[in-house]
UniProtKB/Swiss-Prot annotation:
It holds the Pfam family Homeodomain. Residues 68-114, 127-157 are annotated as: Disordered. Residues 127-136 have a biased composition (Basic and acidic residues). It comes from the Eukaryota. Acts as a transcriptional repressor. Capable of transcription autoinactivation. Binds to the consensus sequence 5'-C/GTAAT-3' in downstream activin regulatory elements (DARE) in the gene promoter, thereby repressing the transcription of CGA/alpha-GSU and GNRHR. Represses transcription of myoblast differentiation factors. Binds to core enhancer regions in target gene promoters of myoblast differentiation factors with binding specificity facilitated by interaction with PIAS1. This is Homeobox protein MSX-1. It is found in: Nucleus.
């Protein structure tokens, strides 16, 4: 504070009585009075540490942890200040946030403060994230929400064609019998009852076996004949020449070409038909059209 001028009354706010400064008093007395007032005002102001404020980092983090946020923040800040060796009045510490020191106040939240997290060893931080013992919530452990076990997909069973129970086994013809049957089929594809009975007895076969063999052989001959006809049709089909550069020419020789050109040039013959404009075919002129605009000298 600045010293007051001589001859001015100053009302002391501390003691509540006026202090007159006369002409006989020197400037040293006025300076002493001002110094006393400043000391008293400074002593009346409480000293509050910025770490104990409700908007500090410790207080904000403690508010999200437990309902006793202010008490836990005060305890964490007191522990940090005691470790650093900072002195602070007891009355200010207990009355700044309206909390009293009691043995029942919770103090384990110091580990969740910024200073506690920074001071923790790396093993403690890594251990919480290690997948050795994965912790699950109770609703995840219930079988209702657990994933179903993987099912092994078995290959589908191959369904075979079922034959009749009274199906006769296939007759194993010998080479001599097959040659005789082929020779007889070339001679005659259909056998009468008497011919079939005589031929089957000569080959030591039954009439039914000879009859079925001739039926199968006729079906095979029909399939081969149809395949040969299809090949002949494909060979007899004329190969159409591809259109050169997309230009098709009418059939009939040069006369047909001239007739078509005249029809396109003069249009169809009729009393009310307008003459069509001649169109130059593409590719007939090798020089560019723009060259005809200039006169060569």
């Amino acid at each position: 504070m600045t010293s007051l001028p001589l001859g001015v009354k100053v009302e002391d706010s501390v003691f509540g009585k006026p202090a007159g400064v006369g002409a006989g008093q020197g400037p040293s007395a006025a300076a002493g009075t001002a110094a006393a007032v400043s000391v008293d005002e400074e002593g009346a102001k409480p000293k509050v540490s910025p770490s104990l404020l409700p908007f500090s980092v410790e207080a904000l983090m403690a508010d999200h942890r437990k309902p006793g946020a202010k008490e836990s923040a005060l305890a964490a800040s007191e522990g940090a200040q005691a470790a650093s060796g900072g002195a602070q009045p007891l009355g200010i510490r207990s009355g700044s946030l309206g909390a009293q020191d009691s043995p029942s106040s919770p103090r384990p939240l110091g580990h969740f403060s910024v200073g506690g997290l920074l001071k923790l060893p790396e093993d403690a931080l890594v251990k919480a994230e290690s997948p050795e013992k994965p912790e699950r919530t109770p609703w995840m452990q219930s079988p209702r929400f657990s994933p179903p076990p993987a099912r092994r997909l078995s290959p589908p069973a191959c369904t075979l064609r079922k034959h009749k129970t009274n199906r006769k086994p296939r007759t194993p013809f010998t080479t001599a019998q097959l040659l005789a049957l082929e020779r007889k089929f070339r001679q005659k594809q259909y056998l009468s009852i008497a011919e079939r009975a005589e031929f089957s007895s000569s080959l030591s076969l039954t009439e039914t076996q000879v009859k079925i063999w001739f039926q199968n052989r006729r079906a095979k001959a029909k399939r081969l004949q149809e395949a040969e006809l299809e090949k002949l049709k494909m060979a007899a089909k004329p190969m159409l020449p591809p259109a050169a550069f997309g230009l098709s020419f009418p059939l009939g020789g040069p006369a047909a070409v001239a007739a078509a050109a005249g029809a396109s040039l003069y249009g169809a013959s009729g009393p009310f038909q307008r003459a069509a404009l001649p169109v130059a075919p593409v590719g007939l002129y090798t020089a560019h059209v723009g060259y005809s605009m200039y006169h060569l000298t």
